[in-house]
Amino acid sequence: MRLFGKGRSEGTTVFFATDLHGSEVCFRKFVAAAGFYGADLLVLGGDITGKFVTPIVEDGAGWWAELHGRRIALKAGELEGFEAQMADEGVYTRRMTAAEHAAYEQHPERVDALFLAVMTERLEHWIEYAHERLDGTPIRILTAPGNDDPYEVDDVIRGRGGDRVVLVEGELTEIAPGHQMLSTGWSNHTPWDTHREFDEEALRVHIEEMAARLSDPASAIFNIHVPPYDSTLDTAPQLDEHLAVKTSAGNLLTAPTGSTAVRAAIEAHQPLASLHGHIHEAGGSVRIGRTVAINAGSEYGEGVLRGVLLTVGGGELKRVQATSG
């Protein structure tokens, strides 16, 4: 798949961000980054979608919502502002009557259908927004959904994205002359049993099937959601059997949580750079051999878009720059 645009004499500039988790403001910033940073191509890493739905309930006496276990009273004139705030934080909302809310509590299996409905609405809105804002430009958005993203995400992107928002899961994409990008949003196993998880051997095979088709691994970019194991890009809090954070003497205990298969692939093929996310608090970069491995990090809940600019050309990685805003 060949998707590079005009290119410049100094190379092609890619803007990468990841783990937006449904944040409206972060997606708007992501689309705007093409013009702001002068990028030729936008790459959206995995975990595109939000994590939960907050009902906004009308019970006859007024409106209320539950957030983080706390009930919040809302006036009718405050609803749109609250919904916008929640959208910027990546939270989905749905207005409903008290009877409808009670029905969801009595039939929790219906919540999954509600989640997919509101998730689809936002994703379709994002794709429409990208079409509008990038109209008349050659800028494309390449994306590989992450382990937290339901499979329905792929269908929405295929159905609505056209040539503007392109699904690249499991694909090799030529992002600049002589430079291919290998992409997958699948991860190794997590404590949460999410949608797209492989054991390490299956993930190794998935990556190697793509890597074997690279024209020149040394000039490639790996776009792999989960970071390499024990790289500092994968350092996360340790969890106990109840998924509570472990501490010792008041100090947070951490451990590497990345993928051994991803690390082995980077060590074996030595691409120019590898782009990761997944562990929000482990943003940074490190060298693995000649490869510059990068976790862009994520602060989507605060409305902050963290990203990375890369310029490639002539078989070289000409620039790497972290961004935040």
Please describe what each predicted stretch is.
Residues 2, 25-176:
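Core catalytic region of metal-dependent phosphoesterases/phosphodiesterases
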Residues 2-4, 22, 172-177, 194, ...:
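Binuclear metal-dependent phosphoesterase catalytic core
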Residues 11-21, 178-190, 221-225, 292-298, ...:
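Active-site-proximal beta-strand elements of phosphoester/diester hydrolases
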Residues 19, 27, 42, 47, ...:
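Divalent metal-coordination and catalytic microenvironments
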Residues 21-25, 49-53, 139, 143-155, ...:
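Active-site environment of divalent metal-dependent phosphoester hydrolases
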Residues 34, 38-44, 241, 262-266, ...:
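Proline-aspartate-enriched helix->loop->beta-strand connector
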Residues 109-121, 221-270:
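Active-site-proximal segments of metal-dependent phosphoesterases and phosphodiesterases across multiple
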Residues 177-220, 241, 252-258:
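Binuclear metal-dependent hydrolase catalytic cores centered on His/Asp/Glu-rich metal-binding motifs
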